[in-house]
Amino acid sequence: MTAELLVNVTPSETRVAYIDGGILQEIHIEREARRGIVGNIYKGRVSRVLPGMQAAFVDIGLDKAAFLHASDIMPHTECVAGEEQKQFTVRDISELVRQGQDLMVQVVKDPLGTKGARLTTDITLPSRYLVFMPGASHVGVSQRIESESERERLKKVVAEYCDEQGGFIIRTAAEGVGEAELASDAAYLKRVWTKVMERKKRPQTRYQLYGELALAQRVLRDFADAELDRIRVDSRLTYEALLEFTSEYIPEMTSKLEHYTGRQPIFDLFDVENEIQRALERKVELKSGGYLIIDQTEAMTTVDINTGAFVGHRNLDDTIFNTNIEATQAIARQLRLRNLGGIIIIDFIDMNNEDHRRRVLHSLEQALSKDRVKTSVNGFSALGLVEMTRKRTRESIEHVLCNECPTCHGRGTVKTVETVCYEIMREIVRVHHAYDSDRFLVYASPAVAEALKGEESHSLAEVEIFVGKQVKVQIEPLYNQEQFDVVMM
């Protein structure tokens, strides 16, 4: 199966789609007016210290102060001696920072909703093969590099470039890479860090010291270890910029770059636009006839699996098992496609067979292993729910593309026509007792107004008799179903 990246560029927006086997697996979107700031380094100033929350707010020049927890401040632990095994405890925030103090911080989570960005003082600088860790003295290796001999080789090579400036983490893409390429990467990261430290010496505060790469370059860097067959770009300027970027940092990717000039929009090649639309819906259909219901809330994401129309096996246990197995693949894809993070609760269809539960869990873990974002599956809880987490750094596709519904205000439901009709009648009675008027005029949405004139007309007539006044109903086309006004005449 082929894998490729499609880069779609307009003056205000860049979108990158990752296609594997002809199917959209990931979509990355960046808008000029709302560029993500994860990875950016700032010189900020502590604006508030909150001992009760073990946190501080830091002004880094954004609209909202950013959040810094004590556990994200380095050095953030101290050893408690006198026990058989060492324990590490987070030091009190008041001992670590003070109001008005200048700090160099890095953004680890974009602002989301009412929350400001989340920060750390544990700075890291990523490149193609390495991650530079200022102040560290060790070399770490990605767990995805399984060969022990290769891990040792890489550690030995990279250890030579560790000094007082910092240490390194060796990324998965470094597997099999020669010493020259690793040395070049290490030197590049140290040059970047030197520039950051020079900028930090400036007397002013609340400004950016380092900016993460633009979306297209960042995705190419992060996909450097992926087996891509081609990278198609529909913008000449972006294509040339990526040629320059890959020629310097990822030369083997250069030959895969193509400037797409076809008449058909680039995303139409793989039905990407429709896939994006489907990724905004709650319901995800499974090929078997079953389906998922995905609900994203501020606290967590929940996924519910249902058999739906799937009755393909005589044995109910087998039907449930096969639906759950199919669901694991769909869930893993949807988490990547929608960029869902944080706590995720999965409600598989109940299984009494312990072997079936074990195999479903294994299938989920295998499907998630393809995810480039860190995931952790905790297994089935006592209530039969699977609890897992997925690292959240950037906004989900829903938060990028959608606003809160102005009708239901994020509830996901609106009051029924019947409910609104009865609210209007109660309001008429309330106003009648409070004020003097000759008659009432009700403005309501088309559906509610029609109901008041139709099936609820008898109830409205009883209200007229009770208040002793005429009630006239008028349609207001611009009102949503819950809106109405009762006007005294």
Swiss-Prot record:
GO terms for cellular component: cytoplasm; cytoskeleton; plasma membrane. It comes from Escherichia coli (strain K12). Residues 39-128 form the S1 motif domain. Its main location: cytoplasm. This is Ribonuclease G. The gene is rng. Keywords: Cell cycle, Cell division, Cell inner membrane, Cell membrane, Cytoplasm, Cytoskeleton, Endonuclease, Hydrolase, Magnesium, Membrane, Metal-binding, Nuclease, RNA-binding, rRNA processing, rRNA-binding, tRNA processing, tRNA-binding. Its cofactor is Mg(2+). Changing V131A: 3.9-fold reduced activity on 5'-PO(4) substrate, 1.9-fold reduced activity on 5'-OH substrate. Has wild-type 16S rRNA in vivo. It is found in: Cytoplasm; Cell inner membrane; Cytoplasm, Cytoskeleton.
